Amino acid sequence: MTKSFNKYKSYENKINDIVKKIENADAIVIGIGAGMTASGGISYMDEKIVKELFPEYANLGFKSIVEIQSAFWKLSEENKLSYWGYWARHIDRIRYKTKLLEPYKNLVEIISNKNYFICTTNADGQTQKSGFNKDKVFAPQGNYDVFQCIVPCSRDEVYLNENMIKNMVDSINEKNQIDEKFIPKCPKCGNYLIPNLRCDDKFVEKPHMYNLDKYRDFIMSNMNKNIVFLELGVGFNTPGIIRFPFEQLTDSSPNATLIRINKGMATVPKEIESKSICIDDDINEVLIQILKMI
């Protein structure tokens, strides 16, 4: 498909069109990616965020959260204390200490009384903190609030980690290492636990797939109605989960509209340009404008 920037209307007219589409929608499918959280102030590519949230690593020369994650991506015997020195802090500060971000607050106000379903690739817990009905959220990429066995010895067991995270964080020394006695271990087999994130084929996905059928059924049951695909901050890290399916579904549904809001990545295939509204701007600013008109 040929890409287009969809610049057929002014910003104000696009906001008006979005409001009308949302108000008249029989169903709204919302796709939330990393750009949504970035719009709320936590961008994994922003050096300023490293200085604010992870000064210990900024002092070591790291320029982004992505760069730090790359340095501690895999747990090994050699790096286990430093690995958890970072990941315990990351989960503590991103998942547990970060409050509900403004873009999510605004989204709640916009869609709370609508017929909606959410798919998110984020693991930061912001959709949970938003208070959305958990039966209307499909989050297949994992969650920072649970661990899984590194093997894994079970394909359906994950473990809540808040207390484990607290113990590790409290034990971190000046070398950014945890006390070895707090390394989390699998209660079933005794091997190491790791964050439950979709990194490879060892990911324990079953606990996150319970709403998959509901998500599919919601889409299919509304395909011939006025269905809106509202995509917020979805880029090309995992486009096969939200971005590409939303394009394909918009193309195949006679009354569908794709609303794509994303700073720097608000293009659509030319084939669905007439069925799309794209805004290349800060997501939260757009949501504020939408909220003013609803």
Q: What is each of the regions a protein language model found here?
A:
Residues 1-294:
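Conserved catalytic alpha/beta core of Sir2/sirtuin-type deacylases, generalized to analogous enzyme cores
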